[in-house]
């Protein structure tokens, strides 16, 4: 059983180059969950350990997206999110590590304790922050900040077919860990869902690796 789509399908993999930003495979461990209704075994895939730098499982997408940007000769990355967006900050940090400038279009969100940390990190690494969202005319904003700047745009949450390849790999990775006996084949998998690119990729990867299980997407953003 292969760990990645490229290993399983080499001819396809040659057309999907990526940067080495992630520490993979991430661990999969078993735990006993005690509830009033009884005790249950649950497996946990520790994708919080995907990057030693920052970003959790967002880095699975960024490996492919930032490689494509560099391959196309971009000098600046632009992406979108709320002011506390983990995706936006992860993109800015890893873009900076690849000597790419970054513009983040950030929209309002309800205050959380993490927002000051996130904004301070953006300032430390020199992210260009542009207010974005309701009441702002987007086309004029894009012309002002993107036109003529040799910019590569990464969609909200990194969700696009190329970003989802990172989670197709996650499906193959989990299938290999099941085959190796690290965890049993789960009856169902729960995954956080925002823009759902990770969900689409994981479902595709599990199907390609012939892991027959239910995938439940849990909404974490409005």
What are the residue ranges of the model-derived segments?
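PLP-dependent amino-acid enzyme catalytic core
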Residues: 1-222
């Amino acid at each position: 059983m292969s760990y990645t789509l490229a290993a399983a399908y080499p001819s396809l993999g040659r057309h999907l180059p990526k940067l080495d930003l992630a520490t993979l495979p991430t661990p999969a461990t078993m735990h006993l969950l005690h509830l009033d209704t009884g005790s249950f075994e649950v497996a946990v895939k520790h994708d919080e350990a995907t990057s030693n730098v920052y970003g959790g499982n967002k880095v699975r997408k960024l490996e492919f997206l930032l490689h494509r940007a560099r391959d196309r000769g971009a000098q600046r990355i632009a992406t979108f999110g709320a002011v506390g967006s983990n995706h936006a900050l992860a993109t800015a940090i890893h873009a900076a590590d690849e000597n790419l400038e970054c513009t983040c279009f950030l929209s309002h969100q309800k205050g959380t304790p993490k927002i000051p940390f996130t904004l301070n990190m953006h300032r430390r690494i020199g992210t260009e922050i542009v207010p974005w969202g309701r009441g702002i005319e987007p086309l004029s904003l894009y012309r002002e900040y993107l036109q003529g700047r040799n910019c590569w745009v990464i969609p909200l949450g990194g969700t696009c077919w190329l970003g989802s390849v990172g989670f197709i790999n996650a499906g193959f990775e989990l299938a290999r860990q099941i085959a190796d006996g690290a965890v049993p084949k789960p009856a169902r998998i729960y995954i956080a869902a925002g823009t759902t690119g990770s969900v689409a990729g994981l479902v595709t990867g599990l199907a390609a690796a012939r892991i027959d299980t239910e995938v439940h997407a849990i909404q974490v953003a409005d």
